[in-house]
């Protein structure tokens, strides 16, 4: 795959940049660690730029990877606008506010109730005011690992650029015109599975020629190590059938429907308890749905786990 992406780059050792948000516990973040461990560092110099140096997986970054320093402006995106105003980030705060208002208007017009437009607009509206990332470097390949993909497109110099998709686009609400303009500037779009590819192309068929399949990478030694460390948590002590779901608490994962599904299964006479490992913006929604279905004893949120 890398040979295909770098086929026109003549140097012996290639210079790569990977950009992502942070390294909190999550499937995409774990996949990034796997990707970093898979590089042959005799052939590639790999720089990693994170918007924030945060998360439990920071310690998993391979020593051969060059972790670039934080750039203060990019850390603003994760904090409340009111706070960033007090910190003196006036222009970026106003850009975020403009993006928030534009996203709210778009969602209202299209009757979206839980869209990803706000996140996209947060990056889109602040991007013009962000500094360049490694402004003196021209990379052979730059990878934007998590959407939105504006920063690698506009703030990185590279001969080739790839944007990654981890999300099922059949389950999220986006501004198709705006995202089309974002995706079109990339040389390739990396999809983690055939299903993700199919659902992405159902929304963006014009990018069929750009899609390449790069499945999530987990080194064999890492999997063995995690398996040997695994212990069934004391929290999972229910009798009967146990179901475990793991993932980020967001619309695409559909965890908010678990309480109703669990209720229906139990009404049919099956003794099940459903555990949820993860975190995210839908946690309060899931808790509310658990209460509404009266499933407090049978749907249990376990939160973050290092080794689920």
Describe the residue ranges of each PLM region.
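Nucleotide-sugar donor-binding and catalytic loop/hinge architecture
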Residues: 9-15, 225-242, 266-267
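N-terminal strand-loop element at the rim of the active site
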Residues: 18-25, 43-116
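Short hydrophobic "strand-cap" motifs at the C-terminus of beta-strands
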Residues: 19-20, 192, 214, 245-249, ...
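A conserved mid-protein helix/loop that constitutes part of the nucleotide-sugar donor-binding site
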Residues: 29-34, 241-264, 270, 281-287
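Nucleotide-activated donor-binding/catalytic signature segment of Leloir-type glycosyltransferases, i.e.
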Residues: 64-68, 287-305
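Membrane-proximal helix-turn-helix segments that form the acceptor-binding/catalytic region
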Residues: 127-138, 150-151, 170-192, 196
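Active-site proximal beta-strand in glycosyltransferases
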Residues: 141-169
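Donor nucleotide-sugar binding/catalytic pocket of nucleotide-sugar-dependent glycosyltransferases
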Residues: 160-166, 170, 184-226
């Amino acid at each position: 795959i890398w040979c295909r992406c770098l086929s026109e780059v003549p140097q012996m050792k290639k210079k790569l940049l990977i950009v992502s948000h942070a390294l909190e516990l999550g499937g995409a973040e774990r996949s990034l660690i796997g990707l970093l461990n898979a590089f042959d560092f005799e052939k590639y110099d790999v720089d990693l730029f994170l918007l924030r140096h945060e998360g439990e997986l920071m310690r998993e970054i391979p020593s051969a990877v060059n972790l670039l320093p934080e750039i203060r402006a990019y850390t603003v995106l994760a904090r409340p606008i009111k706070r960033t105003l007090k910190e003196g980030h006036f222009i970026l705060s106003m850009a975020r506010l403009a993006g928030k208002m534009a996203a709210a208007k778009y969602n209202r017009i299209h009757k979206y109730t839980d869209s990803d437009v706000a996140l996209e607009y947060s990056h889109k509206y602040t991007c013009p005011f962000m500094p360049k990332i490694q402004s003196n470097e021209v990379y052979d390949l730059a990878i934007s690992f998590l959407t939105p993909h504006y920063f690698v497109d506009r703030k990185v110099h590279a001969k080739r650029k790839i944007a990654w998709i981890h999300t099922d686009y059949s389950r999220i609400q986006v501004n198709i015109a705006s995202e089309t303009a974002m995706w079109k500037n990339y040389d390739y779009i990396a999809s983690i599975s055939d299903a993700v590819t199919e659902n992405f192309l159902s929304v963006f068929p014009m990018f069929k020629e750009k899609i390449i399949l790069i499945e999530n990478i987990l080194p064999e030694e890492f999997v063995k190590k995690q398996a040997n460390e695994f212990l069934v948590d004391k929290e999972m002590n229910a009798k009967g059938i146990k179901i475990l779901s793991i993932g980020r608490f967001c619309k695409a994962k559909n965890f908010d429907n678990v309480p109703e599904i669990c209720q229906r299964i139990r009404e049919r006479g099956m003794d099940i308890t459903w555990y949820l490992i993860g975190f995210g913006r839908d946690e309060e929604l899931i808790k509310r749905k658990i209460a509404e279905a009266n499933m407090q004893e049978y749907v249990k949120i376990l939160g973050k786990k290092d080794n689920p």
